[in-house]
């Protein structure tokens, strides 16, 4: 079922921003297996996308983000961010209304460091990051992290207000944080 929808919607970001299809995909496992919870169909990289960084998903290659632009990133506002992600919140509302009351609706976000690693394009592989690239942003890391925290919180709040029962924070690349940065 999902593969059919996906094959008809090549742009993954646009699929995530299609409220009706996102809800339909979310509900497929519930309808088929009567699970206890549904997980909203979305992606952790919707935050960088809403903050102005182009995100593409390359077949058999994973996500590819355009080069990070600090000025663009820092010059965002909550209204624009929320407006871009409104279709996700609408998908949550639609799904919540279609779910039985005894079923939980789970949504999610990426944690600051995980998003930062994707946004700066510094992941070499599953076990290391490009420290040379990271060091290019050394003086701005705290500022970038604080901005990410702000928008992650906005996204969490909006998802809860839309009807999510639980919001999972994925910190997929926390183990790649250099020890020198953990204190910061």
Residue ranges and their predicted role:
Residues 9-11, 71-80, 134-141:
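Short glycine/proline- and acidic residue-enriched helix-loop micro-motifs
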Residues 44-47, 62, 112-114:
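A short acidic, glycine/proline-enriched capping/turn motif at secondary-structure boundaries
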Residues 49-52, 95:
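Pocket-flanking alpha-helical
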Residues 60-98:
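A gly/proline- and charged-residue-enriched helix-loop-helix capping module
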């Amino acid at each position: 079922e999902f593969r059919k929808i996906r094959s008809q919607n090549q742009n993954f970001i646009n699929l995530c921003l299609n409220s009706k299809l996102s809800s339909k995909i979310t509900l497929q496992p519930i309808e088929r297996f009567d699970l206890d919870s549904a997980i909203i169909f979305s992606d952790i990289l919707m935050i960088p996308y809403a903050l102005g960084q182009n995100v593409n998903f390359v077949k058999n290659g994973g996500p590819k983000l355009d080069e990070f632009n600090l000025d663009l990133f820092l010059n965002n506002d909550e209204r624009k961010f929320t407006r871009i992600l409104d279709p996700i919140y609408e998908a949550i509302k639609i799904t919540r209304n279609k779910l039985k009351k005894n079923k939980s609706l789970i949504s999610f976000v990426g944690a600051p460091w995980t998003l930062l690693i994707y946004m700066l394009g510094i992941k070499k592989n599953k076990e290391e990051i490009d420290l040379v690239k990271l060091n290019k942003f050394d003086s701005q890391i705290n500022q970038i992290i604080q901005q990410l925290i702000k928008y992650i919180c906005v996204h969490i709040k909006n998802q809860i207000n839309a009807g999510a029962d639980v919001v999972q924070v994925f910190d997929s690349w926390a183990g790649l944080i250099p020890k020198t940065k953990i204190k910061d």
